[in-house]
Each structure stands twice: as structure tokens, then as C-alpha cells.
Amino acid sequence: EVKREDLQTVHSFKIRGAYNAMRSLSPAERERGVVTASAGNHAQGVARSAALLGMSAIIVMPTVTPQIKVDAVRALGGEVRLHGDNFDAAKAEATRLAEAEGLSYIAPFDDPRVIAGQGTIGLELIQQDAHLDRVFVPVGGGGLAAGVAVLIKQLMPGIKVIGVEHEESACLKAALLGGEPITLHHVGLFAEGVAVRRIGEETFRMCRALLDDVVTVSSDETSAAVRDIFDDVRAISEPSGALALAGLKRYVAEHHLSGERLAFILSGANLNFHQLRYISERSEIGEQREAILGVTIPEEQGSFLRFASVLGARSVTEFNYRLSAARTETDPARIFVGVRIARRQERAEIVADLEEAGYDVIDLTDDELAKVHVRSMIGGRATPGVPERLFSFLFPESPGALAHFLQVLGTRWNITLFHYRTDGADYGRILCAFAAGPDDVELTEHMDRLGYSYNEETTDPAFRFFLAR
């Protein structure tokens, strides 16, 4: 069973909690209006609810919010105010406005009225199928999971409720391990609708008491679930909207479930169209339909043909190679190859076949750097004798954002590698290497001062295999 919240007027479940919270306000509070901070589905839910209830609504959004989202909120009747470079700054401004102007602040998840509104999905699920065994619910701030769990456990306690988190924003898992809500240092933004650094206090209390289990999934698994939904019902889900299905599939595989009646919540469909390219590319890996390999072969005539013969009838999905001017005649060639597979175990079989034929092979299927950047950069390697450090960056997309990044980066260190990629989401990705040694403390300090989310990738196997000297 699938509960389709993408069919809401704002294409997301968020209108339920916002409407319930705003409907419960007193006449005087309604007269004064409401305020919230959001750059996502909650913003549209509040704006639409205000229009339905005849209230004014101020939506504070970060200045880096894509114009398409600003326009969507304004089209629903919300008054948008842009403030700050991130959500925390926008929330602080919304809180200030609430106090200064006597407005009611509508929280995105950690509010009993919002939780109750989201919980109505649980009632409709039971009405849709009273014989369910398990329900899978996406978890961001926890409002949806808490609301659905409390209602189902009250009416049908035998139904198990499973929370599903993205592995790069698993704030509930962190809180369960720590015994209390914990602020994550970094969250991935692929599944933006659940990209929450810290679960709510009330939602954590309820989720800990009522959820039967929690499972985490990857971007690849989520992308595969987006495609599954399209194949089954011809709906295009946003990544966070497909999260519950990704969790359902993982849970079934890990626990060898069969014969049970399962349901998941398709929580939203506010997808940036250009993100589909990235999702389509990653869904093959998420479905275990593609293996990504780095293979060393002799740099000699006929070596490609011999390599292909080892693969046999298997379908090659990608083959990247470039002769480097710095390579000597005795240096081997390194190729980046994608191979279509029918099942997960076939990855190991392909690697074994290649190794038996005398090739050195690295399985890069689960290597994020390889899938996002390196596959587009196969070519020359670093200059011999020049030390190099590699960093990946995440920065908000907006007009001129790349130029601003380069200005902030400065010219103190020589850039030896650069790759920029946008997947249509609100954040862009950059891979950048500098001519610097591991003991260059000044470079590390400079990275910390930039103000961008970053990771050092110097030891990444895909980088070492294809691009490092």
C-alpha cells in the first residue's frame, strides 16, 4: 500500500500539521497572523493554510533560497521575507518577528498541534487497509513519524511502525544512541525534506516510545525508490518522499519478510526537475543494477579487446579512459568502467573474473567521490614531485555562487584539480585539489574559515587510483 501525500494541493503532507496548528489559534491570534521559517514544504503548507483560514502569514526564508521556491510560496499567498544565509538565521529572524509583532510561530515539527495534524495520515492509512502488518514512515524532524505512530498505536497497536532516515541526516538514530536529541555536525542535502540537524524534543520522546524500529538508507537506494514509484504509479516523488519505500525495501531484504501487508508514505513531490538527471544516474546503483570498477590494464595495443573479452556478454554502461602525457611507456592504463548487473552478488563475481585474468581491480560502487566527481574527470594524473591535498565542498546554489566561492577561496594556494557539479538541487558540489603537503596547517585553518561545508578526500581510493601520482 502507498499513502500518496503528493496529491495534496501543496504536493506534501506538511499542510496537515500547519493547518491543524493554525486552525487551533484563538480569534485574536488569527487576527494578528502567523510567522514561520522554512525554505521547503513547510513554507508552502503554512502559506496555503493561511489562505484557507483567511489569515496573514510571513515566511522567513534564507537569502540563498532558489527563486522557484520563493515564487511558489508567494503564489500561495504567503509574504516572503529573505533573511540570513542559512536556516538558523532565518529561524532567529522569525522568532524575533513573533515576539516583536505578536505573531504566532508555526513550528515545522516540534509542536503537539503539528504532530496531531500529521497523525491524521495514520487514520487514513488504517481506513485504507485495516489489515496492515507494518507501516514505513520517513523521519526528518520527527513530526510525521510521531503523529502517525501515536495514532496507529492507539487504534491498531498490532501494526508495527518503522521510521526511515537518510544515512546523511540520521538525527533520530543519533538521538537514540545518545539517549537525547543530538545536533549533527553535518547533514547531506540530497533528501532535502528530511535534512534536519536535530530532532525535536517532543518528537524524539514520542518516536523513542512508539516506533518499533528505525532503518537508514543511502542516496542510491532512495534514487531507486523514486524510480520504483514512477514505474508503479507514474508519480515523480522528491527524494525525501521516496525515503519510506527505500526503507521498506531494505527492511524486507534484511529481515527476509514475506507474506506481510506493508505500507509506506509517499510524503511529497516538490522536486526540482533538473535533479532527475542525478536521480536517474544513481538509481541503477541503488537497485544493484550497475557495478562501478577501477581496473588497471596494460598500456598496449589490443588490451581493451582482451579486457572486454573477460567481461563476456555483460553490458558495459560506462567506459572512461584517457592517455596521459605524463605516463611512460611502462606505466599501465587505468580505466573507469560501469557494468550492468542483475543481482548484487554479481559484483563480486565480475571482480573475481577480472582478478583471475590478471587485472588489478578496485570496486568503487559504494564510493561517493567516484560516482559524483571522478567518473567525469578520468585523465591525466598529478605532476610528479608536487604534493597535493584534495577537498570536497558543498555550497548553496544561487546566481554567481560559483564565482563567489572562488573569490572566498582566494589565490594563496595553487589549484591542481577542479571539478564542479550541480545535480539540480539547492546545493552544488565542488572537488578541488591544492599544491600542499599534509603538514600544511595554514591550508587546514583556511578551509575552516571559508564558511562552507567541506571534507578532506586526499586518501579516497578513487582519487588515489585515477588522479593522484
Show the residue positions of the predicted features.
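PLP-dependent amino-acid enzyme catalytic core
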Residues: 1-401, 408-469
